[in-house]
Each structure stands twice: as C-alpha cells, then as structure tokens.
C-alpha cells in the first residue's frame, strides 16, 4: 500500500493506476499517474472547453456548458453511457482551472454542482475529479487524474468497483493514442 491508502493496481513505464477506499462511500476512488511526452499546450487541448465530450473518454455520451463564468471557470452538464443493464447517469459540474507557477502545475477540478441544474430523466450522480498537469520539460509532463464518483440509484458498488480501473486504463490509453496522432 502506498501513501494515503492508495493501492497500486497497474504499472507500466508511463502509467501507474491506483485505487483506494473512501470513507462513507461504497465506491472506490481511482488515480492515474501518466508520463506524457508531448508539449503541455497540446495536452491541455485534450481537455476541451466543456462544450462536448472529451474525445478520449469512452463513457461520455454528451456534455455542454450551462454557464461560463470566465475562461477558467464554468458549469457543465454531462451524461455518461453505462453498459446495459445499468441506467445512464448525469452530472452537473463546477469546473475550475488553476495554475501554480511555483510547481508548474495546471489543475482542472470538477466538483458537484447539482443545485444549479434541474433533475432530468437520468439518475443524478456526483463526482469529484481532478486533472493535474505538471510540466517537467518543454516536451514532457506528468498528468495525474484523481476521481471518485457516487453513482446514485440502485447500482452494485461491487460491480462498478470491479471495472473502474479498467475503464480508467482505457481512457488513459485513448488519450495517449490521440496525443501520438496529433
């Protein structure tokens, strides 16, 4: 077990995937640490502006901006497509980009903001997600993705927890592939 309860689930030269239990939740939290060999500006383009799904996230069905506060802050509404027989979920996020010039780290934080958008036909889930990009050199960086989701509804945490690492691995692989193609 690593610091703060993180357990290494998968490791390669460029990707490390972790999981850990979260107090007061039946769903695990996941983390990816990814060494990226591309310019940070190219990597940041992969996060879009909230107006559509990120190309590299396979479960995203739709996404749109509800309210843009500034270039660094907005509210977004997203729907994820879950495998049958699980029903799709929707999310309302507060999205905030911050930059720490000392550590050369840019962080995109997504946190629940359910109160600003009405309930829909989908089961409302909540998630806390962080994407941090730390610049190492002009052409390399480390991306750290941390996420924890409360899926809501009647869904088996055991089943969901069993696929979260594989789903994160797929998304990371998709991101790396897109970066190579650009």
Where do the language-model regions lie?
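Eukaryotic helix-grip
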Residues: 1-182
């Amino acid at each position: 077990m690593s610091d703060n309860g993180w357990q290494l689930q998968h490791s390669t030269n460029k990707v490390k995937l972790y999981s850990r239990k979260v107090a007061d939740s039946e769903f695990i939290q996941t983390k990816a640490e990814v060494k990226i060999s591309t310019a940070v500006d190219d990597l940041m383009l992969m996060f879009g502006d909230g107006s559509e799904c990120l190309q590299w996230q396979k479960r995203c069905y739709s996404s749109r901006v509800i309210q843009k506060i500034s270039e660094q802050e907005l509210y977004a509404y997203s729907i994820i497509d879950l495998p049958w027989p699980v029903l799709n979920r929707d999310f309302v996020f507060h999205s905030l980009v911050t930059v720490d010039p000392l550590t050369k780290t840019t962080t995109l934080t997504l946190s629940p903001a359910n109160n600003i958008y009405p309930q829909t036909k989908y089961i409302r889930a909540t998630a806390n997600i962080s994407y941090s990009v730390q610049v190492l050199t002009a052409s390399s960086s480390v991306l750290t993705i941390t996420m924890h989701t409360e899926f809501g509804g009647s869904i088996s945490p055991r089943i969901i927890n069993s696929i979260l690492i594989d789903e994160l691995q797929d998304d990371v692989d998709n991101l790396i592939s897109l970066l190579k193609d650009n």
